Amino acid sequence: MAMKRIFCLFALICFTVIITRAQTPQDSARWNPDEVIAFAQYDTLTLEMDCYFPNDDAEQHRCIIFSYGGGFVDNNQRQVSIRHFCRRLADDGFVVVASNYRLGLQGVRFKGPLRMIKPLENAIGMASEDLMKVTRYVLDYASELTVDPQQIILVGSSAGAIISLQCDYERCNRTDLALRYLPEGFRYAGVIAFSGAIFTRKGMKYTHDRPAPTLFFHGTADKLVTYKKFKLFNIGFYGSDAIVRQFKARHYPHKIIRFQDESHIVSIRYLANYEEVRWFIDKMVVDAHHYEIDETFFDPFRPKTQWDTIGPGEMY
C-alpha cells in the first residue's frame, strides 16, 4: 500500500512547546540505565552498553538497540534525552540497549567531500562492527537479558542511524563483516533511522536477503547526512530518499516521513516522534503488516535553528 500525504502545521506555539519539552527533558536519576555491560576492549578503550529493563516478570521481551548520533566524533550515549527515550521504551515493555562504538572521525579535518570518502568509510566500518558485536552479545546472552532473539530492532540517530541502516545492509548482502558476527539466518525485526544513510563501494543493491521493515525520518534540506545521495562511480553514500527508491522498486515494507525544507535537526526528534516509533513497531514489526508509506511533513512557520547552517565544514 502506497500513501503520500502532506501535512501543514499551523499551531506554531503548541508545536514549539511540545518539541522543546520533548528534546530537553529535565535530568532524572530514574532515567539512568539499570545495568552497564562492557562488550568490547580495544587497547585502553572499553566499549559499554547501557541496559534498561521493563519492570515485569516476563521471560522474553522485544529488544531495541539504540545508537546515538555525534558525527562519529562525540560520545552522546548518556545524553539526557537519550536516557529519557530509552527509559520510556523500557517502561513500555522493551529491553533497551544503548550501545557505544568507536569514533572514527575524531581528529579528522574536513578537506572536501572526495577526501572524506576514505575516513568516512573507515568510521562507518568500525562503528558498524561494534554494533554487530552488540547484536551478537545480545543474541549470546538473550536468556540472561530476557530478550526474544527474533525481535531485535535497531534504532539510530544521525551517525547511529547510519550504522543501523548499514548493519542491516551488510546482513542483506552477507558481507564478510556480517558473516563474522551474525549467525546464519539471523534477521533484524526492524530498523528505525533518524537521518541515516548507507555507504557502499559496489553500488546500492540488496543481493541476498530482504531488508527488515524500516522507518525513515529525514529532513529534505539536511546538510550533514545527505537526504538524496552522493555518488562517484560505484562509490556512494545513499540517504533516505535514495534508499526508499530501492525499497519502492522491490516492494520492501517501509515508511518514510520527509520533513520538507528541514535540516539535520530531524535526527534528534526521537522523543517528539515517539508515537510514530511505537506505531511502526506495533503495526509493521509486531503485527507484520506490509505497508509502503510515504509522508511529507511541512511546517511553514518553522523557526530557524543552528542546524540549518551546519555542514561538514563546521563539524570537522
Over which residues does each language-model region extend?
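C-terminal catalytic histidine-bearing segment of alpha/beta-hydrolase fold enzymes
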Residues: 248-316
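Short beta-strand element of the alpha/beta-hydrolase
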Residues: 60-71
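N-terminal cap/lid segment of alpha/beta-hydrolase-fold proteins
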Residues: 23-59
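Short amphipathic alpha-helix adjacent to the substrate-entry channel of hydrolases
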Residues: 77-99, 104-106
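Primarily recognizes the serine-hydrolase "nucleophile elbow" in alpha/beta-hydrolase
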Residues: 136-210
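The feature captures the conserved acid-bearing segment of alpha/beta-hydrolase catalytic domains
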Residues: 179-250
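Alpha/beta-hydrolase active-site loop
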Residues: 117-144
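Cap/lid segment of the alpha/beta-hydrolase catalytic domain
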Residues: 76-77, 100-125
